[in-house]
Amino acid sequence: MFFSLFLVFALGIIGGLIFEKIRIPKIIYYILLGILLGPSVFNIIDKSLIDISSYLRQIALIIILTRSGLNLDINNFKKMGRSALLLSFLPATFEIIGITIFGPLLLNINVFEAMLLGSVLAAVSPAIVVPRMIKLKEEGYGNNKAIPEMIMAGASMDDIFVIVLFYSFKGLVSTNEFNAVSLLSIPLSIILGLSLGLIVGFVISFIFKKININKILLTIIVLGISFGMVALETALKNYVSISSLVSIIVMALIINIYNKDKGNEIKGTYNSLWQVFELLLFVLVGVATDVRYALSSDGAILVGLILIALVFRSFGTIITMIGTDLSFKERLFVVFSYLPKATVQASIGAIALNEGLMAGTIILTGAVISILLTAPLGALLIDFSYKKLLFKEENIKNEINIS
């Protein structure tokens, strides 16, 4: 296992730096590296590392959700208004609808499996979008209408919305039936998860205010409690459904609201943790990918399905901007910004396969193809279009100085 980890980190860091230099998202390289090192090509990765990959992916998901909660700014939603709120769920909803309609027609899957596939593919990638929006904001592009802030606010909630839907749909696929009990269990698990997160968040915030704790210990406490909430969900699943993922997000959000300084310290440490788990996550997704299936006719059909879904998604994104003062060019830029996928697809794409669901291979392959297709496409569209599509605020200052 240790030699495998050495290869993953050594080759991952070197190749990742090269890809960043040529302005291609490094996660693309990580996935390709995993495919090369995995059973599909050279079969170098030790089986013991593959055996614990599902646990590593779950830890990565916990880190993703905690960072989402810590970075979620409620004031941004108040400031951005209706468009930011709609961006947090409407494009993803349209994409899921598109896949639910066309998935059963094009692939050998039922409606529930198509919904599950849609929930995996529907999330936008903050890992690609957020750094670029920060860069735009610093350069003054789109600031006159707060476009970078609107996109960041919507994208942060988009992931949370899709992940909650994924776990809800997974329950439907596992039972393969849709009845009143299964329908009621979805909002109940969310409400219970929300309640647990609020209680734990307020208690932790109170303790953190009363006791001076260094940032490393703060991180260990929050991470340990997150593990505990996931374990609680597993222990109680035969009696009551609790969404531990919602609990983790809400806990992090409460800490950030009521103890901003401590929240920022935890955020910094979690960002460092993510650097490690990002590499592991995407490489292990590549390792789990069945290249023969991806290159088969079903793989080609998945590419077509993803493109159809992106059309649905883009239509949903356009609807969110109806009634705003955004120009055609600015609306087009928002559509581009909502195309790239990566983090969520990598963290939940293999879960269906690990749990033995019939559509597991299709879902994982779809997740990988969506990353390889949309991550570089979205990144390049953002990078090469923003100067043409967005207004630069400095122009106003220059006009004032000249006059």
Question: PLM features: residue spans?
Answer:
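Transmembrane helical cores of multi-pass secondary ion antiporters/exchangers
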Residues: M1-S403
